[in-house]
Amino acid sequence: WNEALHGVARAGKATVFPQAIAMAATFDDEALYKTFTMVSDEARAKYHQYQKDKEYDRYKGLTFWTPNINIFRDPRWGRGMETYGEDPYLTVRMAVVKGLQGDDPKYFKTHACAKHYAVHSGPEWNRHEFDVTVTPRDLWQTYLPAFEALVKEGNVQEVMCAYNRYQGKPCCSSDKLLIDILRNSWGYENIILSDCGAINDFWQRDERTPRHETHPDAESASADAVLNGTDLECGNSYKALIKALKEGKISENDLDVSLRRLLKGRFELGMFDPDERVPYAQIPYNVVESPEHV
């Protein structure tokens, strides 16, 4: 995984564009589409160069945890610059996902990821234990519209569940958020993944960093997360799924549901096909930091 909030992050050179909140200030969705088309061009070019060089490290793939579509209404939240501001409608209109994922009828250019689902707008210091309380009106009019639009209109391929709890349950095991709303109501059939360490927050005890501690152990936490729709985690708790399977907390059929989604995503990125079949594999490396992008 990597991020591309305003350019391909971390993995070597890339064109750096303005921060997300500055791009939102243009109110120009067409400009954002063009910007993230350039970003995804560079992402694809860098990916295929890494493949040729046999470099398979983190930050060198095709999954980008972008955009951050949380609503920014408190200036004390230090990550507000990652977002598109305080307005749900403007956040919906920013054409980041379509620019990142491309328009080929068979292959996705990259995977975009809508984060952090849901009701996650800071503060950072207590997000691993915080239980969010919002009115139904605020949930549906403020915090969910951007996610719904990216699922229904943007065809976003990944959704990241947030660290915090909602109505007493961690977001990454929330049947209300993940099953009832995201999958059943909105018809989302693609990948749900956790933020880094989010599943550990279910069960891990840490005196320095209070956590949710809603589950007794890693196997219970991991099984609950998968059964409620979280296909993939960033972390190490899912190693306990083997034990959870042996203890009857989850079945192979349950695991296969998530496995199919994950493999489908890789097939649709063209990762198992020869480069000559994938149009995005033909993007030359010289687009990276090119004068046209600057």
Region annotations inferred by a language model:
Residues 1-294:
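Glycoside hydrolase catalytic-domain context in secreted enzymes
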